[in-house]
Amino acid sequence: MHKIFIIFGLLSLCAAHSLRDLSNKDEEDPPSSAPGVRKRRMMSEEDQKTVDYYMDKLNKLADEKHPEEIERHKNPELVAWDRKRDSVLNPEEQGKFFQGDIVLYPEQAKALYEQALTEGKTRVKRKFIGSNLRRWDASRPIIYAFDGSHTQREQRIIELALEHWHNITCLNFQRNDQANSGNRIVFTDVDGCASNVGRHPLGEEQLVSLAPECIRLGVIAHEVAHALGFWHEQSRPDRDQYVTVRWENIDKDSKGQFLKEDPDDVDNAGVPYDYGSIMHYRSKAFSKFDDLYTISTYVTDYQKTIGQRDQLSFNDIRLMNKIYCSAVCPSKLPCQRGGYTDPRRCDRCRCPDGFTGQYCEQVMPGYGATCGGKISLTRSTTRISSPGYPREFKEGQECSWLLVAPPGHIVEFQFIGEFEMYCKIRHSLCMDYVEVRNSTDFANTGMRYCCYGTPPTRIRSATTDMVVLFRSFYRGGKGFEARARAVPEAGNWNSWSPWTACSATCGACGSRMRTRTCPPGNACSGEPVETQICNTQACTGMCAQKREEEGQCGGFLSLLRGVRCRQEKTVMAPCENACCPGFTLQRGRCVR
């Protein structure tokens, strides 16, 4: 069966709005594990043993580096039950694979271990998404198929997630269940939620496993993002500038899941770290007890932003388009508010949440209520609130405000009165929320506020503008009320802290950070944290590199038949790449 996606009006409307759960299974659908379905494995038994070997060594190495332990008296069965409850929200964390849902090839597992051994000493060159070998050809449809292990309803939901990726990027997907060779994605139900990262470099099929608990649009979009080349957000080389990993709170056998990627392997295309990414772990992922944080955000008000599995963030989409679609539109539009030229419609901009219009020049109108808009502030207080406050708002209502202070002023925002927005308290995660974007780039996900009790934070903008978003996806509630005003851009910051050490020695592969604080009572403008690329000189000298050599294959049958295989070997050789992915060499320096 061949099928090329076209844009269906109803599906587009559903997909563009939000990747939410759908209703219960259709009664006519057969069980997902229907008899007669061909059983598959994510990889061969021999390859699995190799990967398990290196993953075990990785966990032991991480445990040696971070030996902190917290002793608690808790029934192991209760701990297992807590994790089973967690799987409802983030089922991809419960898998047996690397970081829960990433299926590594043997050479990848070995390279990860070698990187961990030599961290900060030797550059180990590897071919992950930073290499074109694992990127799909955006000029051709990506072939996908089902192996028969999903019901018709489950297939429809999976295709809706693909349709969403299709609508927001230049990528096209084509179904072909009869294809038996070449690169293609095969959806199966073989082992929880799991996928490889990027295209198979040898032109073979790759499995994306989606068990019944994974059939949610947000989780499917997450796994498809892996197949298209995305790693987890908190694995970025620069993550320590945004979050702190609480090693002492991580389950003993899971510390290897929090290793960072080598800068050589990841091309972030200049897109900043994204707390709201659908690829980010939640706050308590892989914790040894359900009340312990394993990831703490550097700015505490971002804590409830991380870990969502509802929708692709604007920066998730922007990164995918930068990697695959940057050449689609011959000319770029003068997009505002962090927008960029839409590769699906080159005559319009793709806008961050809260903005619309050809150039993102308009504030998005309210949905399900008359609310939001652009408000020009003065020094007098202006109040904004959820629809109907203090009465309860309704499920599905959305409001967007752009608060603008006059020149020489910034925006001051503070919650007042009763506050209630639906959240998952155990997971420290907002389901419905008020989001405040106060940075210099409105493309970045902001701080999300939810749960019960009025947030005490007094928020000030980095510029004359601030965006406030009210989103009620799941249920009604009391909502919020806040006051905003323009305050003079007065008072100075305290001095910057010293720069942190650069995370890499050359090639523009590293970054560094410094911070500053605003004294109480001052209305400081600008950002409290600054990061920059560092050590941009070209890499020279010797690097640990992967080389292919012909040798005897492993396995009894291969030895018996005398089969020869191409094998990887790590050797010291002159560095192949002078610059990290996304940078080019110009006059001895690596520039973007």
Swiss-Prot record:
Glycoprotein listed as a keyword: yes
GO annotation terms (biological process): cuticle development involved in collagen and cuticulin-based cuticle molting cycle; proteolysis
SS bond partners: C170-C325, C193-C214, C371-C399, C502-C534, C506-C539, C518-C524
Range of residues in the leader sequence: 1-18
Domain of life: Eukaryota
Protein name: Zinc metalloproteinase dpy-31
Residue ranges annotated for the Peptidase M12A domain, each copy included: 127-326
Residue ranges of the propeptide: 19-127
Region (Disordered): 22-46
Enzyme Commission number(s): 3.4.24.-
Boundaries of every CUB domain copy: 371-487
Binding site for Zn(2+): H222, H226, H232
CDD domains xref list: CUB, ZnMc_astacin_like
Compartments where found: Secreted
Resulting phenotype, H280Y: In e2920; temperature sensitive mutant. At the permissive temperature of 15 degrees Celsius, few animals survive and are short and stouter
